[in-house]
Amino acid sequence: VLLDKPVGGLPSNDGVGRHPVYINGDRLVTFAKMVGGIDDENILEMLRTAKGFRKLVHSVGVSIVGDLPDKGVTFTLGFSGELGSGGSRNSMKITTDGTEHIMVMDEQQWSDSDETPQEFLFELVKPKDIATATVKLYLNDGYTVPEVDPDPPVAFDTPAYGEMIARSCLSTGNNIRIKRVLQQLRDGKPTTIAFLGGSITQGAGAVPSQEMCYARKTYEAICERYTPDHGAHVRYIKAGVGGTPCQLGIIRYDRDITRDGAVQPDLIIVEFAVNDEADETKGLMHESLIQKIWSAPNEPAVVMLFSVFANDWNLKDRLAPIGWRHELPMVNVLDAVSPQFRVGVGERSVITRRQYFYDVFHPS
């Protein structure tokens, strides 16, 4: 259910590197489909409950690889109890040399009040420690699942990769403001690039989250390509908060990006295309946010970014009309990656679904 998954690199208040991988709700089922290739509905349904999980799973195998000699990692399998209360948890120490360690389910103490699987927790000695983890579920007799084939390397240097990236451009919009920002960058003038969004902008799924999040990588790529001094004159602001929709984004734009008028960003990437599903205004609030940013006196450039969930869903159909009305550049990740996930027999994806997604909601 996890294959070479990066863990670690998360900020911590107590000096311990805790990295949870949540398996509640549909998360474990999605991992089983995406990583394990399982399509047996009976098996998938059993993974949703603690009772079904323990009936199905004989043991949990965990292997970790990392340059962490003599440190080790503590792995915990946790369940949640009735009405979301804390459930039973069992742990084991894992070496980081790739050796598989086995947790036999019947040899552990579990509570009868456990209702659902909750998390795989990896505890590293220090917050900045990073490793890769593989978690396998060994099933009891009578259940059959397909063998897992290793993914080939991502085909970066291929025409197909270029075609995939090109598909992400939903609209170039009226790019006069973008051109102005690029000229500022080339001229070495002070420029501020800001990112506003939810957990994807925050860096969930990226390991380490601050260095490998899409916002940081985008900022670094822009500086490398367009500035004469590797971005020495470019200010980077990342305002991503997990679980926040555009209703809070309007408030956070003032607080976290403009700092109540003290900062005037030149380029803003807005990413709320998966957090706004519950927006009762059906996009009106999102448009208010876009108008607020777009109408600033310094005339910043605005790019709308539509990320995607592992079930090939986002809010492009609802939000793209906003971008078209305002003639904004728009990037739709769904159009880029989802079509090539569904290749035919004998064909190769540029990047597989399990390579692209860290979990149900976040890219790796």
Can you say where each PLM-predicted feature lies in the sequence?
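Residue-level detection of beta-strand scaffold positions
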Residues: 100-102, 272, 289-290
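Surface-exposed alpha-helical segments enriched in charged/polar residues
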Residues: 220, 291-295, 320-324
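A short helix->loop->beta-strand "cap" motif at the edges of active sites that frequently abuts
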Residues: 294-303, 328
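General small-molecule cofactor/ligand-binding pocket signal
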Residues: 237-239, 303, 331
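Conserved SGNH/GDSL esterase-like catalytic core that processes O-acyl groups on lipids
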Residues: 155-287, 298, 308-315
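Catalytic His-Asp segment of secreted/periplasmic serine-dependent ester chemistry enzymes
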Residues: 164-176, 276, 310-364
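N-terminal secretory targeting modules
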Residues: 1-196, 201-209, 226-232, 358-363
